[in-house]
C-alpha cells in the first residue's frame, strides 16, 4: 500500500489552547493515526514535501502552507465572520475585513471542510468557490465514556458530594456563549451544582473581558468556573456530572456537545435551526431561561425523563465518533489524490 504524507497545521499547537478549534485539531491528528493506515502523519512541519496539507487555523501562520501549490491543500472552516462577534474585542468594527480575509483564505484551498451545514451555507453566501464538504468535528467518544465507578472516582477527586445533581457546561467564557443564562439557571436552582469548564484563553483580546471577569467573580455559590484546564481534568468534570447544558446563541458546530453526549449525559441546548440540522432530535431544548430551568429541574427529579434524554443524546456520540467521521475524511482525501495523479 502506497503511503501518502499529510501535514496537519494549527498554530494552536504552540499558541492559545483551551478552545474548540484546538480540540478539533488534536482529534483529527489522533483519528488519522488510528484510522488512516495509508497516511504518514506529520504536524506543523515546515519544508515537508507532503501530498496533503490540512489547515485548521486561519491566522497568518497558516498562510505559508495555504499558498503551497505542490500538494493538495484542505482547510477546515471552524470559523465564519459571525463567530468573532461576541468572542473577540472590537469584532463588529473589523467584521467586514474578516469577511474579506476569510473568503480569500478559503478560496485558496483545494477543498474546504465545513463543520456543519450552516457553515457550508454561510461559505456559499460569502462566495467561496472552492469545493465545500460538510465534515463535522469528531471525538474519541470512548475517552469520555462514564460509568458508576468512574463517576464516583471523578466526584471524589473533584470533591463533589455523591448525592448532588451536577450540570456541566464547557467552553470559553464569553458573551456569545450566554453565560448570563447559565448563571440565571443556577440562581433559580440553588440546590443544583453548576460547573463551567473553561475560562478566557484569549485574555484581554476576548470580548467584554472585564465584564466576564466580574461575572465569574460574582457568580452564585453553587457555580464553579474552572478556568482553562488540562484535557484529562476536563474529562473528569464530564464524568462527575449528570447533565450537559450549553445556552450559547451561536456555534459553528460545538464539539462540546459530543463530549457531553459521550459521557452519557442528557444534552440541553438553546432552540435554534442550526442544531436541528446537526443534532436532529437527539437533544433537549428551550427558547429562554424559564424553559431551561424547567428542563433542568425535571432532569433532576424525574428518572424516566432523565433516562429518555440520555438515550437520545447517545445518538450524538455514535454519529460523531472518530471512527465514523474518519471514513468520510479518508474517502475525500483518497478521491482527490486519485484525481491529482
Predicted regions and their residues:
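Aromatic "clamp/platform" in nucleotide-sugar-dependent glycosyltransferases that forms part
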Residues: 249
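Short hydrophobic beta-strand element within catalytic cores of glycosyltransferases
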Residues: 262, 266-269
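Membrane-proximal helix-turn-helix segments that form the acceptor-binding/catalytic region
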Residues: 94-112, 213
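Conserved donor-binding/catalytic core segment of Leloir-type glycosyltransferases
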Residues: 161-177, 183-189, 195-197
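Glycosyltransferase donor-sugar binding loop
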Residues: 170, 193-211
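Short alpha-helical donor nucleotide-sugar binding micro-motif in glycosyltransferases
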Residues: 228-229, 236-241
Amino acid at each position: 500500500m502506497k503511503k501518502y504524507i499529510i501535514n496537519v497545521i494549527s498554530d494552536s499547537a504552540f499558541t492559545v489552547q483551551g478552545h474548540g478549534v484546538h480540540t478539533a485539531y488534536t482529534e483529527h491528528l489522533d483519528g488519522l493515526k488510528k484510522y488512516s493506515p495509508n497516511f504518514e502523519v506529520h504536524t506543523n512541519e515546515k519544508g515537508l514535501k507532503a501530498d496533503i496539507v490540512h489547515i485548521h487555523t486561519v491566522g497568518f501562520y497558516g498562510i505559508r502552507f495555504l499558498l503551497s501549490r505542490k500538494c493538495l491543500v484542505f482547510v477546515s472552516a471552524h470559523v465564519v465572520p459571525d463567530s468573532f462577534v461576541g468572542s473577540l474585542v472590537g469584532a463588529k468594527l473589523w467584521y467586514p475585513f474578516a469577511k474579506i480575509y476569510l473568503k480569500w483564505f478559503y478560496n485558496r484551498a483545494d477543498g474546504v471542510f465545513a463543520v456543519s451545514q450552516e457553515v457550508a451555507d454561510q461559505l456559499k453566501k460569502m462566495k467561496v468557490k472552492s469545493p465545500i464538504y460538510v465534515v463535522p468535528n469528531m471525538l474519541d467518544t470512548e475517552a469520555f465514556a462514564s460509568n458508576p465507578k468512574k463517576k464516583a472516582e471523578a466526584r471524589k477527586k473533584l470533591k463533589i458530594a455523591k448525592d448532588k445533581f451536577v450540570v456541566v457546561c464547557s467552553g470559553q467564557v464569553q458573551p456569545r456563549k450566554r453565560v448570563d443564562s447559565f448563571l440565571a439557571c443556577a440562581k433559580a436552582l440553588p440546590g443544583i451544582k453548576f460547573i463551567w469548564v473553561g475560562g478566557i484563553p484569549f485574555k484581554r483580546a476576548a470580548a467584554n473581558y472585564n465584564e466576564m471577569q466580574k461575572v465569574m467573580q460574582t457568580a452564585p455559590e453553587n457555580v464553579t468556573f474552572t478556568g482553562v484546564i488540562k484535557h484529562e481534568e476536563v474529562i473528569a468534570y464530564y464524568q462527575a456530572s449528570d447533565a450537559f447544558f450549553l445556552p450559547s446563541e451561536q456555534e459553528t458546530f460545538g464539539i462540546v456537545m459530543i463530549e457531553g453526549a459521550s459521557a452519557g449525559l442528557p444534552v440541553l441546548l438553546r432552540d435554534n435551526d442550526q442544531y436541528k440540522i446537526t443534532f436532529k432530535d437527539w437533544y433537549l431544548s428551550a427558547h429562554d431561561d424559564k424553559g431551561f430551568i424547567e428542563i433542568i429541574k425535571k432532569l433532576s427529579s424525574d428518572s424516566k425523563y432523565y433516562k429518555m434524554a440520555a438515550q437520545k443524546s447517545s445518538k450524538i456520540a455514535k454519529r460523531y465518533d472518530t471512527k465514523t467521521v474518519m471514513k468520510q475524511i479518508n474517502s475525500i482525501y483518497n478521491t482527490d489524490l486519485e484525481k491529482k495523479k
